[in-house]
């Protein structure tokens, strides 16, 4: 039978919810076969991050030039910085039958939904907004004013979870990782995804 086209897996949620930590845990698992689509951003690199591994870090001018060339599936400006997903890698990798994993901001996920309505959208939620505030303070990288700005934005983003197919609470990283992997596995078994393949198999068997 022909190879099944890959899934586009979109993980997003409020800043500070732990998207990057959960994504790293998923890709540390030897059983993970997803291809990670690295996002591009104009924000400053954080301690421990690697250019070309965690993000492609670009200047604002370079990023805006790529916008003009229509080189993004999605892009958004969030708290003064651009974030975007390069388009060609995603399309090529899915056509090869690989699942592509995107870790992006909520505004970006809205754009992806319009262009890839069949993608799998997972909202990573904090146990509470107080818990989220503690995580942001614990980073020690931002002012109180910036943290409050992120909390205000998080409130709006939580209200937008109806745009997603699944909600995973990040109360513990390993549990969140396992939940996401189970969701992806179940998605591959949906009748809508496999029916055409098996109908083709039956028709070929009758020849």
UniProtKB/Swiss-Prot annotation:
Q: Which Pfam families match?
A: Guanylate_kin
Please name the top-level EC class of this enzyme. transferase
Alphabetized InterPro entries for the sequence: GK/Ca_channel_bsu, Guanylate_kin-like_dom, Guanylate_kinase, Guanylate_kinase_CS, P-loop_NTPase
Highest taxon, organism lineage: Bacteria
What's its EC?
2.7.4.8
**What is an example of a GO molecular function annotated in this UniProt entry?**
guanylate kinase activity
Q: Where is this protein found? A: Cytoplasm
Summarize where ATP binds, as residue positions.
Answer: 13-20
Could you tell me what reaction this enzyme catalyses?
GMP + ATP = GDP + ADP
Tell me which SUPFAM superfamilies the record gives.
P-loop containing nucleoside triphosphate hydrolases
Give the signal peptide as a residue range, or say none if absent.
Answer: none
- Which residues belong to any copy of the Guanylate kinase-like domain? 6-185
Keywords, sorted A to Z: ATP-binding, Cytoplasm, Kinase, Nucleotide-binding, Transferase
Q: Determine if Kinase is one of this entry's keywords.
A: yes
Is Membrane among this UniProt entry's keywords?
no
User: Mainly resides where?
Assistant: cytoplasm
PROSITE patterns named among the record's database cross-references: GUANYLATE_KINASE_1, GUANYLATE_KINASE_2
One GO cellular component assignment for this chain's record is: cytosol
What this chain does, per the entry, is described as: Essential for recycling GMP and indirectly, cGMP.
Q: Which family does it belong to?
A: Belongs to the guanylate kinase family.
- Report the protein name in the record: Guanylate kinase
């Amino acid at each position: 039978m022909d190879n099944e086209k890959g899934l586009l897996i979109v993980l997003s949620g409020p800043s500070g919810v732990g998207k990057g930590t959960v994504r790293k845990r998923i890709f540390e698992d030897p059983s993970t076969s997803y291809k990670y689509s690295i996002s591009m951003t104009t924000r400053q690199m954080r301690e421990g991050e690697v250019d070309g591994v965690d993000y492609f870090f670009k200047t604002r001018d370079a990023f805006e030039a790529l916008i003009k060339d229509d080189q993004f599936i999605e892009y958004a400006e969030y708290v003064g910085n651009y974030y975007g997903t390069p388009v060609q890698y995603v399309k090529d990798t899915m056509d090869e039958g690989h699942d592509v994993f995107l870790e992006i901001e909520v505004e970006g996920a809205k754009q992806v939904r319009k262009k890839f309505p069949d993608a799998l959208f997972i909202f990573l939620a904090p146990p509470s907004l107080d818990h989220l505030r503690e995580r942001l303070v614990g980073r020690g990288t931002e002012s109180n004013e910036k943290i409050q700005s992120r909390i205000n934005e998080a409130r709006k983003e939580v209200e937008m979870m109806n745009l997603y197919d699944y909600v995973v609470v990040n109360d513990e990283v390993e549990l969140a990782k396992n939940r996401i992997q189970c969701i992806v596995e179940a998605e591959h078994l949906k009748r809508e995804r496999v029916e055409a393949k098996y109908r083709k198999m039956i028709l070929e068997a009758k020849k």
